[in-house]
A protein has these predicted regions:
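Alpha-helical transmembrane segments and their immediate juxtamembrane cytosolic regions
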Residues: 1-328
Length: 328
């Protein structure tokens, strides 16, 4: 897909951080917010390092398995070197690699929060864009994603910090009719581009339709994930706010019908992400190779596998499996 759910998670995380640790603690000492943020960042850093080492050791046990995730360190590598590279964040392995990005972003968050407390949001914007523009100067790859993806997280922090002003501006400067029109246009844009994206990707990778394959492979570089191109950012913005409009419009109904199913997953997001990383890791080892499933199994089997994986994660939350060990 030209935009993934990951971008939305980073944006939401930034929004929540800006609102909960920024705006709501505005009358509290800055030291309090900083301590809470850095404590969370340290926790994520420790978990990211431990999971990398654990997945590496487990991966060595399945070295000849075709479903083993790519990028694992060679078993011949001195273990102390792997530990050092893990601690310095130059090596990451497994399906929980986003934790290290969160840890890095949270480390920089107090600086952003300090600027926001002084009304210097535009300084944050300029610095963030400058850092984002540095990515093309690097060798590229996962070790430099922090440079490009931070623009999403810190944009979220700005939005969260100024959420009351933004909502007041929205209601005060746009009539109800105008708000409805804008919301519907956003949702229509989201649906239209999402369907087009689905047809292109699945037409190229699964249905093997030649014209769609040509369009897809000609377009994919414009939406490069690691670089986080401006086109991907723009499309992600449309998708996020289009989906937000839908969720806000039907929030009460969704809560009534799906609240018991979704709320436990949302309130234990770090735990869910950790458990999910193990489910995905072993699913690829014993069910089908990892990259990508849609090219190997029929769509309905993939659907069953996906639903089963989600059910396993939900069951783990429901049973509070290892709640005292795995951070939440």
């Amino acid at each position: 897909m030209y935009v993934s759910a990951a971008e939305g998670f980073f944006l939401i995380s930034g929004i929540v951080l800006g609102l909960v640790r920024g705006r709501k603690l505005l009358d509290q000492p800055f030291k309090k917010s900083t301590k809470l943020i850095l404590k969370r960042g340290l926790r994520l850093y420790i978990e990211a390092c431990l999971l990398t080492l654990l997945f590496t050791v487990i991966g060595w046990m399945f070295a000849n398995n075709p479903g083993l995730k790519y990028g694992i360190a060679s078993p011949d590598t001195p273990f102390l070197a792997i530990v050092w590279n893990t601690l310095t964040l130059s090596y990451s392995y497994g399906w929980a690699d986003f934790l290290r990005y969160y840890a890095v972003f949270l480390t920089g968050a107090p600086i952003v929060l300090w600027l926001l407390r002084r009304g210097l949001w535009y300084v944050v914007v300029v610095i963030s864009i400058l850092i984002w523009s540095l990515y093309p100067l690097t060798p590229g790859g996962e070790n430099y994603i922090e440079l490009s993806w931070q623009v999403i997280f810190y944009a979220g922090m700005i939005i969260g910090f100024y959420w009351p002003e933004l909502t007041n501006f929205w209601r005060a400067h746009f009539s109800r009719r105008t708000r409805i029109i804008i919301s519907r246009l956003l949702f229509a844009s989201f649906i239209t581009t999402a369907i087009a994206n689905f047809i292109l990707v699945f037409g190229a990778l699964f249905w093997n339709i030649e014209p769609l394959k040509s369009i897809h492979y000609d377009s994919i570089d414009f939406f490069e994930k690691d670089r986080m191109t401006w086109r991907r950012l723009l499309l992600g913005t449309v998708w996020f706010w289009g989906f937000f409009v839908f969720m806000r419009r039907h929030e009460r109904l969704i809560t009534q019908k799906l609240g018991k199913l979704l709320t436990p997953l949302g309130t234990n997001s770090l735990y869910v992400y950790t458990i999910e990383s193990f489910v995905v890791f072993f699913a690829h080892l014993f069910i089908a190779p990892a990259q990508p499933l849609v090219q190997i199994l029929p769509w309905y089997i993939n659907l069953v596998i996906s639903i089963t994986a989600i059910a396993l994660v939900w069951l783990a939350v429901h049973k509070r499996f290892l709640f005292k060990i795995i951070p939440r």
